[in-house]
């Protein structure tokens, strides 16, 4: 039962799953995973919430706790992907990649604001910058103004000083012990952890 807020992406994913697993019944549900969703669960059958990738890191710890607690009400088991804490140099290289993939992703926010909200951002006047904040345990993504200028958004105008940043995104990292503790606070008792050989990423199996 795949869930996504984008109907087009959801339908494409559901079609792909159906092709790859023809014996699997795929029931797509359009919704925001951060809010309660009415999911048709068949009684008597075990349910597992699968939250792959490292999306949970885009939530604050408080939001992650709320999401885990909400999911526990849907299923007694979860599989959750978590990006682990690691050498800050590795994190810096990943979020400031030489190919510029992350920079393009971050700068695309300005294009979307222009298109969807009618602003007049010039992406050429900003550069991408990301760094690890050890006190908060997170990567912070920013867009840095390359020069002093102003931007119009609706009836408002916002002035940027050279070097001023727009804080666009956070990506929280956890140690295995930290995430196990967070899951326990959300009501999950049993925890299994699988990691890659380098200990960069983990899959947590949670049982309520």
Language-model segment annotations:
Residues 50-51:
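A conserved beta-strand element that flanks and buttresses the S-adenosyl-L-methionine
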Residues 57-75:
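A short, conserved alpha-helix within the catalytic core of class I
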Residues 92-176, 180-186:
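Substrate-binding/catalytic lobe of Class I Rossmann-like enzymes that use SAM or dcSAM, i.e.
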Residues 189-193:
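A short linear hydrophobic-aromatic micro-motif
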Residues 36-44:
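Short amphipathic alpha-helix with an adjacent loop that forms part of the alpha/beta core around
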Residues 1-35:
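Class I SAM-dependent methyltransferase SAM/SAH-binding core
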